[in-house]
Swiss-Prot record:
Top-level taxon: Eukaryota
Subcellular location per the Swiss-Prot or TrEMBL entry: Membrane
Organism classification: Eukaryota, Fungi, Dikarya, Ascomycota, Pezizomycotina
Pathway: Mycotoxin biosynthesis
Protein encoded by which gene: gkaZ
Signal peptide location: 1-36
Official protein name in the record: Cyclic ether formation enzyme gkaZ
Species of origin: Penicillium citrinum
GO molecular function: isomerase activity
Membrane topology: Multi-pass membrane protein
KW Translocase (keyword) present: no
GO CC, alphabetical: membrane
Amino acid sequence: MTTARALSDGLAYLLACFNAFCIQAHLTSRFSPAFSKNLATQLPHHNKAIFWWLGVSDETLRYMFVSLNAGLGLLLALPGWRSTGLKVALALLCVGFTSDMKLKEKWLLHFLSHLVLLSITMAAIYVR
């Protein structure tokens, strides 16, 4: 049982690091120029595709994503909140997947990246 818990914790830390990577990519292109550029070019499309009802600017949506990534990364990093963080991650990944599939541009790349993240998250939940 402890091995399964250790695996789940390791996967949760991996997801927390990915959230930190996303924060960095949203705020600066210094360390990941291609990922930053992809996020910046896709953000207005996501705003129109799924977040139109919020009525926020692209810049506001970017900082909302940064806040979500920071909160989720914190939930995943704290042992007492990790189970909750994994469930929140699963829900947010489903929203992101839905948004990417509505865009229909480079859908295979977006599908595969979300499939990998969903697989990691579901594996961490399953072995927990």
